[in-house]
Curated annotation (Swiss-Prot):
It comes from Corynebacterium glutamicum (strain R). This is Urease accessory protein UreF. It holds the Pfam family UreF. Required for maturation of urease via the functional incorporation of the urease nickel metallocenter. One of its GO terms (molecular function) is nickel cation binding. It is found in: Cytoplasm. The gene is ureF. Its main location: cytoplasm. Keywords: Chaperone, Cytoplasm, Nickel insertion. The lineage of its organism: Bacteria, Bacillati, Actinomycetota, Actinomycetes, Mycobacteriales. Belongs to the UreF family.
Length: 226
């Protein structure tokens, strides 16, 4: 058992990591405003779609593709494609902010090949930054299996969104925990599904999700930045 690898995985996939994830709804606030998400069940339905479509074909597939070709040129290509493949401006900006913070945390705490170069390219505005790629750099350097790395990232993302829903909808704390437990099988399925996707599937979207994320940009009263 590699305890250092386990520590890195638990540390960087902690939903409390200061990346700014608490400030983003990734579109569920638009459904709240339209009264289409009013309770735990409706939120869970939305979360399952986000996980199955957007997170699987973008975050999970990007991590898997980097593991297959862990080079600086592939990192650059994936960062550019993730940015270009995200229709909603707020979501692009959210991923860039969180990706920058994740890269800064990794650079500050772990000796990871490519992370300094990645962070410099982000700060020079040559790349945008994405949390899934920053995490993949760290987990790959520690020899952590790609499925474990993807599972940890998706679990952290789902957990952060549930915490935001608890505050925003609002949901009770135990209702949030029930949603988290119910999502475990969907997270596992997303990891498996990402292994079946090809490059042509990269950043596949869902019209409803994409539109709700774009509508949020003009929503007058809101709690979240996306």
């Amino acid at each position: 058992m590699d305890l250092d690898a386990d520590f890195l995985l638990l540390h960087l996939s902690d939903s409390a990591l200061p990346t700014g994830a608490f400030a983003h709804s990734f579109g569920f606030e638009t459904y709240m405003d339209a009264e289409r998400i009013t309770n735990a069940e409706e939120f869970q339905d939305w979360l399952k779609v986000l996980l199955k479509v957007q997170l699987t074909s973008s975050d999970a597939l990007a991590m898997r593709m980097f593991y297959a070709t862990p080079t600086a040129s592939e990192l650059k290509r994936l960062d550019e494609r993730l940015f270009a493949g995200t229709p909603a401006r707020e979501v692009r900006e959210a991923n860039a902010r969180m990706g920058t913070r994740m890269a800064e945390i990794v650079a500050e705490t772990y000796s990871v090949p490519l992370i300094i170069e990645y962070l410099e390219l982000i700060k020079n505005r040559e790349l945008s930054g994405h949390p899934a790629l920053a995490l993949a750099l760290a987990t790959h350097s520690m020899g952590i299996d790609v499925d474990r790395a993807i599972h940890a990232h998706l679990t952290a993302t789902v957990s952060s969104l549930i915490q935001n829903a608890v505050r925003g909808i609002p949901l009770g704390q135990m209702a949030g925990q029930r949603v988290m437990f119910a999502m475990r099988e969907h997270i596992g399925a997303a990891v498996k599904r990402s292994a079946m996707l090809d490059a042509i599937d990269f950043c596949s979207g869902d019209p409803g999700l994409d539109i709700s994320q774009m509508v949020h940009e003009t929503q007058r009263a809101r709690l979240f930045m996306s």
